[in-house]
Amino acid sequence: MAASGAVEPGPPGAAVAPSPALAPPPAPDHLFRPISAEDEEQQPTEIESLCMNCYCNGMTRLLLTKIPFFREIIVSSFSCEHCGWNNTEIQSAGRVQDQGVRYTLTVRAPEDMNREVVKTDSATTRIPELDFEIPAFSQKGALTTVEGLITRAISGLEQDQPARRANKDATAERIDEFIVKLKELKQVASPFTLIIDDPSGNSFVENPHAPQKDDSLVITHYNRTQHQKEMLGLQEEAPAEKPEEEDLRNEVLQFNTNCPECNAPAQTNMKLVQIPHFKEVIIMATNCENCGHRTNEVKSGGAVEPLGTRITLHITDPSDMTRDLLKSETCSVEIPELEFELGMAVLGGKFTTLEGLLKDIRELVTKNPFTLGDSSNPCQKERLQEFSQKMDQIIEGNMKAHFIMDDPAGNSYLQNVYAPEDDPEMKVERYKRTFDQNEELGLNDMKTEGYEAGLASQR
C-alpha cells in the first residue's frame, strides 16, 4: 500500500538511481485523478532508474490514477533504451479498511454466476465443496464476476498441463478430473458456496436485490489477527505515555490520518462526550482541507451492556426528524414499511439526528456503483428510485413509518423528547442475547470471574 504523498518503488528489473537533473512535478489537487485520455494534466512522473539487465540508466514512469467504481492504483513502466529491456506492473494504492471482510455466497442459480466481484491481491477465495482454495497474494486484483473467478482458476490449472502430460506426471490426470469439477460448477447443477475472505476489507460481492436483504449473501466484518496485520504490512504503534493529570473529557485530541475520499493527509479530532440520560461516547470527526470532505464516527466509551436493546420509533410527525440518535457499530437498522434492513457495521458508528441517518442510508443505497452506468439493470434502477422516493416522503413527514434500532451490545440511543416521562411513540425493549449474538460480540469465550484460579493452575 502506498502512503499518501509517497512514490512507490520501481517495478522488478529497475533500481532507482539519484538524479539531481530531474525535479518532481508540482503536486496536483488530487493525488489520484480518475483515469481519462482527455485529461491533459494527468501526466506520469519520470524517474531515471538503473536497469538490472545491462546496468545502464533507463527510465521508470509512474502514474497515480483511479479506476472508476474500483480503487486507486499505481501504474509503473520501466524501459531501457540501451538493451531494450522493459517491464510494466500495476500496484494497489487503496487504503486498508479498519476491519477485514468475509463474503459467503451460496450460489443456487445461474444468475448468481453474473454477480459483480471485486477481488483484491490480499483476498483468499475458497469453495468448501471441492476443498479448493486460492491463497492470498497468489493472483493480482481483479474486477470480474463469480463465473470469471472460476474461469480464471481453470485457466491457471490448465496452464502447465501439456508439460505434465508430456512427462507422464501422475498429477496431470488428477488435475484434469478437478478441472472437470470446476467446469461443472459453472453450470450450477447443484448449489455450492463461494467464500472471499479479505483482511484488507477492500473486496466486494454484488447484492443484485439492493436495497433489500440478500438471503444468499452473508457479509461478516471482523478484526484482523496479528498474522493478518503482518501479512498486510501493518504495524501497531506503541501507545504514548500520558500524564496522570491529563483530563480527556475537557480536551479535543488530534491525530494524523488520510482522507477517505482523496487520500490526502488530514487531521481527525477526537473527544469524549456525555450524552444526557445515556452514557459517555467517543466522537471522532475528520475534515479534509484538500477536497472539503467531512466525516464523523462514534465509538462506545463503555462496556458491553448485560442486555441487548431494541428501540422502535413510530414516525408520525416531521419533528421526529430532529431527534438525536447514536448508532453504534453493532447496531442494525430496520424500516419494515420499505422492507429495508441495514446490517451491523454498515455506516459505522454515528452520532447524528434521525434525519441525518436516513439521508446517509439513502445516499448509501442510491450510490451503489453497480447500479450506475449503462450496464445496470433497469428493474433494479426502478426499485432504487421507488425506495429513494419513499425515503424522501418519510424525511419530509408525508409518510408514517416504523424505525427500529436493534443493538445486541446495548450501546445505541434514540432521544426521548418527553424525558424523563415515557415517549408514547417510542418503545424500548431489553432482551437477553442469543448464543450467536454473544459469539459475534466475542463474549462466549470471555471469562471475567474466577480467572485467577485458572492462571494459578497453569503456573
Curated annotation (Swiss-Prot):
CC terms in the record's Gene Ontology section: axon; Cajal body; cytoplasm; Gemini of Cajal bodies; growth cone; neuronal cell body; nucleolus; nucleoplasm
Matching Pfam families: jr-ZPR1 (PF22794), Zn_ribbon_ZPR1 (PF03367)
Keyword list, A-Z: Cell projection, Cytoplasm, Differentiation, Metal-binding, mRNA processing, mRNA splicing, Nucleus, Repeat, Zinc, Zinc-finger
GO BP field: apoptotic process involved in development; axon development; Cajal body organization; cellular response to epidermal growth factor stimulus; DNA endoreduplication; DNA replication; microtubule cytoskeleton organization; mRNA processing
Major location category of this protein: nucleus
A GO term for molecular function: zinc ion binding
Annotated stretches, region: Disordered: 1-32, 439-459
Biased composition (Low complexity): 1-20
InterPro entries with a match to the protein in the record: Znf_ZPR1 (IPR004457), ZPR1 (IPR040141), ZPR1_A/B_dom (IPR042451), ZPR1_jr_dom (IPR056180), ZPR1_Znf1/2 (IPR042452)
Chain intervals annotated as zinc finger (C4-type): 51-83, 259-291
Cellular localization per UniProt: Nucleus; Cytoplasm; Nucleus, Nucleolus; Cytoplasm, Perinuclear region
Subunit structure and binding partners: Component of an import snRNP complex composed of KPNB1, SNUPN, SMN1 and ZNF259. Interacts (via C-terminal region) with SMN1 (via C-terminal region); the interaction occurs after treatment with serum. Interacts with elongation factor 1-alpha EEF1A1; the interaction occurs in a epidermal growth factor (EGF)-dependent manner. Interacts (via zinc fingers) with EGFR (via C-terminal cytoplasmic kinase domain); the interaction is negatively regulated in response to epidermal growth factor (EGF) stimulation and EGFR kinase activity. May also bind to the PDGFR receptor.
Family named by the database record: Belongs to the ZPR1 family.
Record's function text: Acts as a signaling molecule that communicates proliferative growth signals from the cytoplasm to the nucleus. Plays a role for the localization and accumulation of the survival motor neuron protein SMN1 in sub-nuclear bodies, including gems and Cajal bodies. Induces neuron differentiation and stimulates axonal growth and formation of growth cone in spinal cord motor neurons. Plays a role in the splicing of cellular pre-mRNAs. May be involved in H(2)O(2)-induced neuronal cell death.
Identification of the protein by name: Zinc finger protein ZPR1
Protein source organism: Papio anubis
Gene transcribed to yield this protein: ZNF259
